[in-house]
Amino acid sequence: MGRLDGKVIVLSAGAQGIGKAAAIAFAKEGAKVIATDINGEKLKELESYKGIETRVLDVTKKDQIEKLSKEIDRIDVLFNVAGFVHHGSILDCEEADWDFTMNVNVRSMYLMIKTFLPKMLAQKSGNIINMSSVASSIKGVVNRCVYSTSKAAVIGLTKSVAADFIEQGIRCNCICPGTVDTPSLRERIEARPDPEQALKDFLARQKTGRMCTAEEVAHLCVYLASDEAAYVTGNAHIIDGGWSL
């Protein structure tokens, strides 16, 4: 018996990193997983796993989200993972950077939740998990201005949805990781003027001496997706190795 037997889970950003690790972990626990991503080629890597279906999806496109919703009869868990990390202070953030980050990190979750929540309400049960960060209202982080602003908004969105629909059987939580060793992080490191120093800087701020793995975050995802967390809603779950202390 798996911890997620019979559950239908839809998630975004499933092609790599936390989204991919979570999709695999969900499937191993018996869930039917519909993993989406804008990168169709990378997404194909998940098709070899039992219990995982894939769909190409741009989470900033309302019409694509609505089309996906019509293809799915039931949804037990919605996991919003897609996000973008902008590097810089407010002075480095142009209006286009601000708009793009907010569109990907916040508006996409608004669109996904607003589209799939009615199905959950009709079922009188549902579970929403949003990806936030400790770089948010939890902790001020250098050169993460618009990113942190967007992730603070995700915490607010999470708590609002949880409060509004708790009596209708809906749970909503968010996950707030610290620095997670993912392909996205490695790409950002390589894009810095001195990648070797950038990596050292990331490691230096980790009180545990290492970065979190995507698989460790996926363990928390499984818990929140399962009935073990049936009494848990409206919370920002920190998994940062003590970085925010």
Curated annotation (Swiss-Prot):
Catalysed reactions listed for this entry: cis-4-hydroxy-L-proline + NAD(+) = 4-oxo-L-proline + NADH + H(+); (R)-3-hydroxybutanoate + NAD(+) = acetoacetate + NADH + H(+)
InterPro entries linked to this entry: NAD(P)-bd_dom_sf, Sc_DH/Rdtase_CS, SDR_fam, SDR_superfamily_enzyme
Gene Ontology cellular component annotations, sorted alphabetically: cytoplasm
Residue positions binding substrate: R144, R188, R205
Superkingdom of this protein's organism: Eukaryota
Assigned EC number: 1.1.1.-, 1.1.1.30, 1.1.1.104
Pathway per the UniProt entry: Amino-acid metabolism; Siderophore biosynthesis
Location within or outside the cell: Cytoplasm
Pfam families from the UniProt entry: adh_short_C2
Sites where the protein binds NAD(+): Q16, G17, I18, D37, D58, K151, V180, D181, T182, P183, S184
Molecular function per GO: 3-hydroxybutyrate dehydrogenase activity; 4-oxoproline reductase activity; oxidoreductase activity, acting on the CH-CH group of donors, NAD or NADP as acceptor
SUPFAM superfamilies referenced in this protein's UniProt entry, alphabetically: NAD(P)-binding Rossmann-fold domains
CDD domains in the cross-refs: DHRS6_like_SDR_c
Keywords recorded for this protein, A-Z: Cytoplasm, Lipid metabolism, NAD, Oxidoreductase
EC category name: oxidoreductase
GO biological process: heme metabolic process; lipid metabolic process; siderophore biosynthetic process
Keyword Ligase assigned: no
Active site per database record: Y147
Binding partners and assembly: Homotetramer.
Function field: NAD(H)-dependent dehydrogenase/reductase with a preference for cyclic substrates. Catalyzes stereoselective conversion of 4-oxo-L-proline to cis-4-hydroxy-L-proline, likely a detoxification mechanism for ketoprolines. Mediates the formation of 2,5-dihydroxybenzoate (2,5-DHBA), a siderophore that chelates free cytoplasmic iron, thereby regulating iron transport and homeostasis while protecting cells against free radical-induced oxidative stress.
Similarity annotation: Belongs to the short-chain dehydrogenases/reductases (SDR) family.
Protein name: Dehydrogenase/reductase SDR family member 6
Annotated source species: Aquarana catesbeiana (American bullfrog)
Gene giving rise to this polypeptide: bdh2
